[in-house]
Amino acid sequence: MEVVPAEIAKKPRTPTSGPVITKLIFAKPINSKAVTGQTTQVSPPVIAGRVLSQSTPGTPSKTITISESGVIGSTLNSTTQTPNKIAISPLKSPNKAVKSTVQTITVGGVSTSQFKTIIPLATAPNVQQIQVPGSKFHYVRLVTATSASSSTQPVSQNPSTNTQPLQQAKPVVVNTTPVRMSVPIVSAQAVKQVVPKPINPTSQIVTTSQPQQRLIMPATPLPQIQPNLTNLPPGTVLAPAPGTGNVGYAVLPAQYVTQLQQSSYVSIASNSTFTGTSGIQTQARLPFNGIIPSESASRPRKPCNCTKSLCLKLYCDCFANGEFCNNCNCTNCYNNLEHENERQKAIKACLDRNPEAFKPKIGKGKEGESDRRHSKGCNCKRSGCLKNYCECYEAKIMCSSICKCIGCKNFEESPERKTLMHLADAAEVRVQQQTAAKTKLSSQISDLLTRPTPALNSGGGKLPFTFVTKEVAEATCNCLLAQAEQADKKGKSKAAAERMILEEFGRCLMSVINSAGKAKSDPCAMNC
């Protein structure tokens, strides 16, 4: 840190006030390479030299100390507080002073501010003299100047410096969202207003007296940051870019983006029709507590006849199989959607007593057994396990060793079982034949009612009755009426008149038949 003292004589503001000597102490750090910040303050060029003062020894002096953070303090012996113009007289000629011209840029950042010294070249194209009317001082404008632009990435704390050539004396619009840059050096005639902005995605605008504006862009394209949306947690809201509208996006997990396969209500069952091999369409079953019934539950279900249990007991087949009652003979039924609360309470009570109450009773056998078997076994005592209320016989499986039945006849070599099975098979075959016959008869009747009368062919030609058209019938009737009038004029008897009319009708029919024969033998005449 080196301190450069300088004394500058200030002109009096009014003729009555005396001159004031101002001492400026410039504090410049040794290392000023890294320049970071958002607010840029540009000081006018300082020309090194000595002060030509005409003040008296009693002239008050003012000392100003300038450091990295700006003006630290000032001591003023005079009461004058208004800003005055500072006149600096060069020590030598203007050309020599230009060579030693030093410009200091104070860049104020978030935490610290640093100085960067720019020394332009003293060549002829780089120096432009400005003549100001009414001024005895020489002003020099720096034509080509370079400034350090700082691009700070929000991800890392270490700033990176990017140097870009900028044009002179033009307003600058700096976008501070991805990149922060410094302001170029302009001449002392331009008045600058630097507006500090907080660190947020806004733009910093530096206005000057000239109306033209230009945007500072880096020489190399900046890498676009593409976020990995797959690693974002659920519920993250993606804000839209500025100027693209108010549409926002939210990240949802994959299990939420699914299409509903079921509607808000459950269709109980469809109308049963006697078609197909089974003869009865089965109903869709509802799983209880995530338990899906096995393939044995696809058997036809007979309607229940409950009267006092409200269809909420396990001996109701509909309730035990996890189905709603539909087309049943039960009375005061609660096994429907209208009494869902009572139904759920009954299901919970049954599961508390027996956790496997609603599991299918007919499941797979043990390992190595391909046949199905009852999960608990039947408890038949008098039916011999040959009635439909035996669950093993109803499922068309044989009783196993876990059954507790008495007098069981539902085993492999039982003659009664074979007879009943044969009868059941014969009855099933008979029902299928009757159903097929009814279906065939109904289809034939519907075909006769819907299909048009086919045109019967006789060797590729038309039959004689197809020639009996409306015109032919009218002509035949006229002939018959003419014969009746002729018989009346001649005074023929009734029998003779009828005979004449019938003979005329036969002649007309023969003419139609002859015409059909001619058309059959001569296709060209028929087509014509």
UniProtKB/Swiss-Prot annotation:
The gene is LIN54. PROSITE patterns: CRC (PS51634). This is Protein lin-54 homolog. One of its GO terms (molecular function) is metal ion binding. The modification Phosphoserine is found at residues 43, 61, 89, 93, 414. Component of the DREAM complex (also named LINC complex) at least composed of E2F4, E2F5, LIN9, LIN37, LIN52, LIN54, MYBL1, MYBL2, RBL1, RBL2, RBBP4, RBL2, TFDP1 and TFDP2. The complex exists in quiescent cells where it represses cell cycle-dependent genes. It dissociates in S phase when LIN9, LIN37, LIN52 and LIN54 form a subcomplex that binds to MYBL2. The record marks 315, 389 as: Critical for interaction with target DNA. Keywords: Acetylation, Activator, Cell cycle, DNA-binding, Isopeptide bond, Metal-binding, Nucleus, Phosphoprotein, Repressor, Transcription, Transcription regulation, Ubl conjugation, Zinc. Residues 362-375 are annotated as: Linker. It comes from Pongo abelii (Sumatran orangutan). Zn(2+) 5 binds at residues 378, 392, 399, 403. Component of the DREAM complex, a multiprotein complex that can both act as a transcription activator or repressor depending on the context. In G0 phase, the complex binds to more than 800 promoters and is required for repression of E2F target genes. In S phase, the complex selectively binds to the promoters of G2/M genes whose products are required for mitosis and participates in their cell cycle dependent activation. In the complex, acts as a DNA-binding protein that binds the promoter of CDK1 in a sequence-specific manner.
